A protein has these predicted regions:
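Canonical Rossmann dinucleotide-binding motif of NAD(H)/NADP(H)-dependent dehydrogenases/reductases
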Residues: 2-32
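The beta1-alpha1 cofactor-binding region of Rossmann-like NAD(H)/NADP(H)-dependent oxidoreductases
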Residues: 39-40, 56-67, 102
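Catalytic Tyr-X3-Lys loop
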Residues: 87, 98-118, 142, 159, ...
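Conserved mid-core segment of classical short-chain dehydrogenase/reductases
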Residues: 87-106, 125, 129-135, 155-158, ...
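Alpha-helical segment proximal to the catalytic Tyr-Lys
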Residues: 125, 174-176
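Residue(s) in the substrate-gating loop at a strand-loop-helix junction
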Residues: 146
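C-terminal substrate-recognition "lid" of short-chain dehydrogenase/reductases
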Residues: 220-244, 249
Length: 253
C-alpha cells in the first residue's frame, strides 16, 4: 500500500516512537491523526508536523471510539493504525513489600494490551468501510510489542505479559481481518531512545547500549518509523512479529 494521501491514526503520537512515526508518515504525504493522553504535548507535536491531534485514553472505550470517529470525520476515512502508546512499570512478583500489587499489574495490561486492542478493533471497523485498492487491500494495522515479550526480565511480569499478548494477537487478528483486505503486523523493539529512557543516567544508558551486539547503541525512533514505512508499503508482510533489536537478547536481570 502506498502512503501518499492515505489516512493514518498513530497512538502515543506525542513523543518517542509515535512522534517519529507520525513525522515520517506526514513527510511521505499521509494524512495523520496523532492520539495521546498528554494534551499539551500532542497538540504541540501536531502543530509542528502540520497534522491533526486528538486527546484520548485509548483504554477507555468511548474515548478511543471518539478518536477513531474524529479521524474519519476529519479526513473522510481510515487506512491504517500504528499503535505506539504504552507504559512501563517495574515490580517483582514477590518483592520487599510483599506480592506484586494487582492494581499496578492491571494498569499495565489495561494500557498496553486493552488499549491497543481497543484501537485495533475500532480502527478495523473503520478501515473495512474504506474502498479497497486494485489488489483488494484496504489498510494495515501495526502494533508495538517489545523484546520483553520473548526475553522478559525479573520485575517485568506485567510488562512482558502485556507485550507477549500483543505478539500473540498478531496472527489471529491477521487471519480474521484478511477477508476485509486488512493486514496486521507487530514490531517488537529492543532498547530505544524514548522518553521512557530519559530518567536513566548516562552510565546506565551506556551499559544497556553495550549489551546490543550490533549496532552497539540504543535504537533511534526514526529506525522504528522506517520499519513502519516498509511494512505499510510491502503487502506481503502480514501476521508476523518483527524484532527490531540489533540481535539483543535480554538477560534475566
Amino acid at each position: 500500500m502506498q502512503i501518499d494521501n492515505k489516512i493514518f491514526l498513530v497512538s502515543g503520537g506525542a513523543s518517542g516512537l509515535g512522534a517519529a512515526t507520525g513525522e515520517l508518515l506526514v513527510k511521505a504525504g499521509a494524512k495523520v491523526m496523532l492520539v495521546d493522553l498528554n494534551a499539551e504535548a500532542v497538540a504541540a507535536q501536531a502543530q509542528k508536523l502540520g497534522c491533526r491531534s486528538v486527546v484520548a485514553d485509548i483504554s477507555n472505550e468511548a474515548a478511543a471510539e471518539a478518536a477513531v470517529k474524529a479521524t474519519v470525520e476529519a479526513f473522510g476515512g481510515l487506512n491504517g493504525l500504528v499503535n505506539c502508546a504504552g507504559i512501563v512499570r517495574g515490580e517483582k512478583i514477590l518483592g520487599k513489600n510483599g506480592p506484586h500489587a494487582l492494581a499496578s499489574f492491571s494498569q499495565v495490561i489495561n494500557v498496553n494490551l486493552i488499549g491497543s486492542f481497543n484501537l485495533l478493533r475500532l480502527a478495523a471497523a473503520a478501515i473495512a468501510e474504506t474502498e479497497a485498492d486494485a489488489d483488494g487491500e484496504r489498510g494495515v494495522i501495526i502494533n508495538t510489542a517489545s523484546v520483553a515479550a520473548f526475553d522478559g526480565q525479573i520485575g517485568q511480569a506485567a510488562y512482558a505479559a502485556s507485550k507477549g499478548a500483543i505478539a500473540s494477537l498478531t496472527l489471529p487478528a491477521a487471519r480474521e481481518l484478511a477477508r476485509f483486505g486488512i493486514r496486521v503486523m507487530t514490531i517488537a523493539p529492543g532498547i530505544f531512545e524514548t522518553p521512557m529512557m530519559a530518567g536513566m543516567t548516562p552510565e546506565v544508558r551506556e551499559s544497556l547500549a553495550a549489551g546490543v551486539p550490533f549496532p552497539p547503541r540504543l535504537g533511534k525512533p526514526a529506525e522504528y518509523a522506517a520499519l513502519v514505512r516498509h511494512i505499510i508499503e510491502n503487502s506481503m508482510l502480514n501476521g508476523e512479529v518483527i524484532r527490531l533489536d540489533g540481535a539483543l537478547r535480554m538477560a534475566a536481570k
